[in-house]
Amino acid sequence: MHTSPMEQPGTGDAGGLNVYVVELSRQLAALGVEVEVFTRAVSSKLPTSAELAPGVTVRHVDAGPFEEIHREDLPAWLCAFTADVLRAEAGHEPGYFDVIHSHYWLSGQVALAVARRWGVPFVHTSHTLAKIKNGALAVGDRPEPPGRLLGEQEVIAGSTRLIASTADERGHLIDLYDADPDRVDVVAPGVDLETFRPGDPAQSRARLGLDRDGDLLLFVGRIQPLKAPDLLLHAAAELLRRDPTRRSRLTVAVVGGPSGSGLEQPDALVKLAADLGISDLVRFQPPAPQHELAHWYRAATAVVVPSHSESFGLVALEAQACGTPVVAAAVGGLRTAVADGVSGLLVAGRDPARYADTLDRLLRQPHWRSRLAAGAVGRAAGFGWSATARGVLRSYRHALSPAAVAV
């Protein structure tokens, strides 16, 4: 409800969830499942429906003004969204939909009401959990509101089945939300192995206008406190403090847009780079389509994912699929996405000096980087979207079985 699969990931509220819904829908359609995606219309110019891929239809629901609405204000439009979904179903024969799959707690609220009305099971994927986010808040982040905590609990309790991205998330659902262990399936997200694959770093650097021989540290994602791009800037400044000669060969690229804003260069990060004395090294880029993003990954010496929390971390998978080692926070799903010491390196804590230590070792040892790069490709190879779709389809079948827990 809060974002559309048609939007460009990396800005506003568009991120890994968008990629997940798009790729999962495509792969489910390839398995013979007819998919309809309901999302809120943010413009009066959008068609009522559009084909995302063969077998996948996106339906734009009228709920609220035709503009972006802050997530905290969206609960006021849940009833309108639900009513429009019910109207869409009324145009079909009874029993047209077999199962509902909701993504994020807001959509889960709609699914809960609609599933009861239609008498069909519903499967829910949280993507993020309020209790986990509130336990790992960044400076400048607002805690998730009580309404989300209550709504999320209701969705988790009322779903037919739950899909967790990792065993850790499954544990959180059981321990923090009292989810029935027998109703929670673990299905890892995937990566598009056709788009994100190894290539010639020199060609990618030439395409992007980057120095052929320098070191490139890359951040990809929404510019928000949770993702902590500021930590990368502090770590880069620490690298230069230790070795000023690095300045001539080091570039830090931040590819993404600020969450909830249309600005291409987030003012706070620009100011931080200036305050740290590294403005000349930092390159801000707007969100890039996937085919261009793959060039950024291939061009990078290392991709840095310093998030405070991640349910999985698709950026880490995409980078590894391109053969680039990842330096990531040892939190949440990143501990599953990245094989520490094999495909990348996990850093405990929030100290920029620790990141600088890790990056320093990586930059100084090209042979070690090469081993990690090979390990990265192997790690990502086990996470194709087709495997994700098969796992999700198994969850649907469990939900549809007579023994499924009633909604």
UniProtKB/Swiss-Prot annotation:
InterPro entries recorded: Glyco_trans_1, Glyco_trans_4-like_N, Glycosyltransferase_grp1, Mycothiol_biosynthesis_MshA
Source domain of life: Bacteria
Sequence positions that bind 1D-myo-inositol 3-phosphate: H2, D13, A14, G15, G16, L17, N18, R71, Y104, T128, R148
Positions contributing to UDP-N-acetyl-alpha-D-glucosamine binding: Q8, P9, G16, R222, K227, E310, E318
Gene3D superfamilies (alphabetical): Glycogen Phosphorylase B
Recorded catalytic activity of this chain's protein: 1D-myo-inositol 3-phosphate + UDP-N-acetyl-alpha-D-glucosamine = 1D-myo-inositol 2-acetamido-2-deoxy-alpha-D-glucopyranoside 3-phosphate + UDP + H(+)
Broadest EC class assigned to this enzyme: transferase
Known EC number: 2.4.1.250
GO-annotated molecular function: acetylglucosaminyltransferase activity; D-inositol-3-phosphate glycosyltransferase activity; magnesium ion binding
Pfam families, alphabetized: Glyco_trans_4_4 (PF13579), Glycos_transf_1 (PF00534)
Binding site for Mg(2+): Y297, R298, A300, T324
Free-text function comment from the UniProt entry: Catalyzes the transfer of a N-acetyl-glucosamine moiety to 1D-myo-inositol 3-phosphate to produce 1D-myo-inositol 2-acetamido-2-deoxy-glucopyranoside 3-phosphate in the mycothiol biosynthesis pathway.
Family: Belongs to the glycosyltransferase group 1 family. MshA subfamily.
Record NCBIfam families: mycothiol_MshA
Quaternary structure and partners: Homodimer.
Protein name: D-inositol 3-phosphate glycosyltransferase
Species assigned in the record: Frankia alni (strain DSM 45986 / CECT 9034 / ACN14a)
